[in-house]
């Protein structure tokens, strides 16, 4: 069997005997209240932690063994309402009281007293701890005690140590979170100048306000006139467009089309004049009983009448 296992089996976990207490006191006076590993070697079955806890909680001259006073009870209740089960923090507020003694006193007496009497555990009376962390709190004794020597430091009640860590892991600790206050800043009463959004073309004077909705007519939107209403046309351009349309209607067709028509008419007229000349020649030779016109008289007359009608309608007299 290994040495660590043998040592664990030889550990004594029961209460301390008076002989062990006397030996511990002598060893602390000899080696000081800090050399717990060295002290534990002289006490069979006791570890350094066990020696330290026995000294700090019971054998130290700074530890008070008297009953808790009413003032101490009120201080514990106020501190517990603020810090919860942070017994080491609360013990710094009471001289001569250990965190273990305060915890036992709370669980055995004060907790039941608050639940039975229906107290809120938050006294507003005189005496005890008033919850003001700004004031100087009583000095906490050193962890090892020893002749009432103080560390010379004011420990903050908010710093966890010792039994605070073990109590926080138990699940019954009260958690106090700061409350964030939201402050609403007053907005300026001055109104901003109105903002305008123009939906018209640059040369128009019509403007539409942002905060005023655009009124749309369903018929107008369906007919495709929505763009015309949002983008009005200048009167000058509208007049020019109307004049161009009027010219187009009065002048007939475009220039290219008119050129083609004129060429067709010119060709037709030349053909017509050639037919007339051939008709005249045919008329002069008809007296000799020779030939006649190249086409029948009825067809020639109809063709001549059609050509004369075209020439008269267009108004062309003579074309080269």
From Swiss-Prot:
InterPro entries xref list: Homeodomain-like_sf, Myb_dom, MYB_TF, SANT/Myb
Regions of compositional bias (Polar residues) in chain numbering: 158-171
Observed phenotype of the null mutant: No visible phenotype under normal growth conditions, but mutant seedlings exhibit increased survival rate upon salt stress.
Gene Ontology CC entries for this record: nucleus
Keyword Membrane: no
GO molecular function, one term: DNA-binding transcription factor activity
Residues within the DNA-binding region(s): 36-59, 87-110
Localization per record: Nucleus
Keywords, sorted A to Z: DNA-binding, Nucleus, Repeat, Transcription, Transcription regulation
Function in brief: Transcription factor that functions in salt stress response. Acts as a negative regulator of NHX7/SOS1 and CBL4/SOS3 induction in response to salt stress. In response to auxin, activates the transcription of the auxin-responsive gene IAA19. The IAA19 transcription activation by MYB73 is enhanced by direct interaction between MYB73 and PYL8.
Name assigned to this protein: Transcription factor MYB73
Organism name: Arabidopsis thaliana
Gene that this sequence comes from: MYB73
